[in-house]
Swiss-Prot record:
UniProt cross-references to HAMAP family, sorted A to Z: RecR
Biological process terms in GO annotation: DNA recombination; DNA repair
Name of the protein: Recombination protein RecR
Zinc finger (C4-type): 56-71
General function of this protein: May play a role in DNA repair. It seems to be involved in an RecBC-independent recombinational process of DNA repair. It may act with RecF and RecO.
Family statement: Belongs to the RecR family.
Keyword set includes Cytoplasm: no
Originating organism: Rhodospirillum rubrum (strain ATCC 11170 / ATH 1.1.1 / DSM 467 / LMG 4362 / NCIMB 8255 / S1)
InterPro entries: DNA_Rcmb_RecR, Rcmb_RecR, Rcmb_RecR_Znf, TOPRIM_dom, TOPRIM_RecR
Length: 197
């Protein structure tokens, strides 16, 4: 492997969240030292994921099925839709095991600074799902940040005129907090004590 190929690997690893240039360099060296036990299985797993995992056309989560296993599960409560920023937030709620409804993954939050508008988040898809029924409540499980609150208000303005209850997570989610970093107990309490937006 030439230095250029190693540099390319380091550069790609550095693009992953939480990995800077130094961490990416260490990860690359670790992979290279453990080719058979780590790098080859990792390449195999990445290839399999790239070939089989896709976004659910209904809710936007990642799955090997379309629609995903959550959307296809008849035991899930179709009257509740929990709106989350991204798949990591959905996984955090599923880990808690307290929500039995369906989800809608936005894929981000509204942000004038970053140029992210309602059309970028597929809010029209959410409105269409609500209009199709049998939804009676939309739970906004969004971060307690400026962008999260802005997104929540836009969604509430879109959904409430349809006569649907719109609620948000209650206490337990700190201002500026990220759902993926909360412990299961805090997340469970916040979901159970949700409130109208």
């Amino acid at each position: 492997m030439s230095a250029g190929e190693i540099d390319r690997l380091i550069g790609l690893l550095a693009r992953l969240p939480g990995l800077g240039p130094r961490s990416a360099r260490r990860a690359a060296l670790h992979l290279l030292k453990r080719r058979e036990s780590l790098m080859d299985p990792l390449m195999e797993a990445l290839g399999a994921v790239a070939a089989s995992v896709r976004l659910c056309p209904v809710c936007g989560t990642l799955d090997t099925r379309a629609p995903c296993s959550i959307c296809a599960d008849p035991r899930r409560d179709g009257t509740l839709i929990c709106v989350v920023r991204d798949v990591a937030d959905l996984w955090a709620l599923e880990r808690g095991g307290v929500f039995s409804g369906r989800y809608h993954v936005l894929g981000g939050l509204l942000s004038a600074i970053d140029g992210v508008g309602p059309e970028d988040l597929g809010l029209d898809r959410l409105a269409a799902r609500v209009a199709e029924g049998p939804v009676v409540e939309v739970i906004l499980a969004l971060p307690a940040t400026v962008e999260g609150q802005t997104t929540a208000h836009v969604i509430a303005d879109l959904i409430e005129p349809k006569g649907i209850t719109v609620s948000g997570l209650a206490q337990g989610v700190p201002v500026g907090g990220e759902l993926d970093y909360l412990d299961d107990g805090t997340l469970t309490a916040a979901l159970r004590a949700r409130r109208p937006v």
